[in-house]
Each structure stands twice: as structure tokens, then as C-alpha cells.
Amino acid sequence: MIFLDYDGTLVPIIMNPEESYADAGLLSLISDLKERFDTYIVTGRSPEEISRFLPLDINMICYHGACSKINGQIVYNNGSDRFLGVFDRIYEDTRSWVSDFPGLRIYRKNLAVLYHLGLMGADMKPKLRSRIEEIARIFGVETYYGKMIIELRVPGVNKGSAIRSVRGERPAIIAGDDATDEAAFEANDDALTIKVGEGETHAKFHVADYIEMRKILKFIEMLGVQKKQ
């Protein structure tokens, strides 16, 4: 089995996250890979976003493990669907913040609200962070700090437990670039784990960037071809 993060692992992280479309080379690579191996995209994004960026019939673990899309069917993990209304309220209560924080972008997802700080001035970020943390306390949701983003998400779920529930004890390759992927590495220490990019990690292996990761996946795909011959 193969479990792959999307942003930063298969595609570069860009300033406009709504434009993270897979290029032709990646589409071809993942299409070939999933024909030979049981392959999942594991991401903080929604199923709809990944389906738009990577228009392939592929299984997914989304919202950092809060839901999955398997064989075309959406499954909410650990009762996460009870938070759907909570995130509606959070978005309604905070969407006016774009007037208070120039450059802030707010994205409503079914099981998350994401605040993108990439275009904000550094002097305003601590104040915004305090506001978001207060909202998290009020609504009982989890705060995640990523690259240029702060996200409010379903508490008590993570990529690690979601991957483990899918794979059981089957051999697996798991790759990711961000802090959320560390939970996947820790909970699946019997897998072949790959950290993409710089930073300390629990992964067994490390590659420089998404370009190197694609090269590894191409090699794995070719091994799959040879095995079938």
C-alpha cells in the first residue's frame, strides 16, 4: 500500500492554495501507480479539492483523517460528521476578520476552517493567532499550525490512526512533508516512511523535495511493472 500527502509531497506549496493542480506528469505517474498498488492520497484538504486538483479515481483520507473517500463513498471517521454544523458557525463568526487583517484569506471546508496568512504582514499575525485560539477554545475544536496557515479542525483524529485503520498490518510506504505527517510516521513505524523536505522527523528516510519524491514513486511504479511481467 502507498499513502501520499499532496501539498509539498506531490506538488509544490504555492501562495494560492486553490491553484494546486496536478501537472500532466503527476497525473500520469499516479494513474500508473494506482494500477499497480493500493494507493491513497492522505491530506488536510477536502475530497472535493483533491478530486478537482487530481481528477483520478483514487482513494483518499481527507481532513487529516476526519473522513475518507473509499471506492467513491465518503466515510466519516470517529463520528466527525457531528462537527459539520460547528464549522458552519465558526466560519460565520470569523469571516468578517478579513476586514481586520489585510491579506488574510479564510476558506470554509466541511470539516475545517482554514486561515491563510501568506499575504498578511508579520506584525498582525500574533493578534490573529490569539483570536483563532480563542475561537478553538469556545467551540472545542483543534488548532493546527502549518506552512502559512492556521486551521481549525476536528479534534481527536489524525493521519496516523486513519492510515493504520485502513492498512492494518499490511506493508506500506507513507510519505509526507508536514507536521501532520509525523503522526502518520509515528503510528506506522513498521512502514517505510519518507519525510519530504527539511526538518526533524520520525520518518526512516528523507528526500529533498516533491521532485525527488516523484522520482522515487516512478522507480516504485517501474518495480511494479517488472513484478507483473
From Swiss-Prot:
Catalytic activity entry: alpha,alpha-trehalose 6-phosphate + H2O = alpha,alpha-trehalose + phosphate
Residues that hold substrate according to the record: D5, Y6, D7
Cofactor(s) the protein needs: Mg(2+)
Keyword annotations from UniProtKB, A to Z: Hydrolase, Magnesium, Metal-binding
Similarity comment: Belongs to the trehalose phosphatase family.
CDD domains, per database record: HAD_TPP
Residue pairs linked by disulfide bridges in the UniProt entry: none
Protein name listed in UniProt: Trehalose-6-phosphate phosphatase-related protein
GO MF term (any one): magnesium ion binding
BP GO terms, sorted: trehalose biosynthetic process
Pathway in which this enzyme or protein is active: Glycan biosynthesis; trehalose biosynthesis
Native species: Thermoplasma acidophilum (strain ATCC 25905 / DSM 1728 / JCM 9062 / NBRC 15155 / AMRC-C165)
Catalytic residues of the enzyme: D5
InterPro entries associated with the record: HAD-like_sf, HAD-SF_hydro_IIB, HAD_sf, OTSB-like, Trehalose_PPase
Source superkingdom: Archaea
Function statement: Removes the phosphate from trehalose 6-phosphate (Tre6P) to produce free trehalose. Also catalyzes the dephosphorylation of para-nitrophenyl phosphate (pNPP), but with lesser efficiency (in vitro).
Inducers of expression: By Tre6P.
The keyword Magnesium is assigned to this record: yes
Binding residue positions for Mg(2+): D5, D7, D177
Keyword flag Hydrolase: yes
The enzyme's E.C. designation: 3.1.3.12
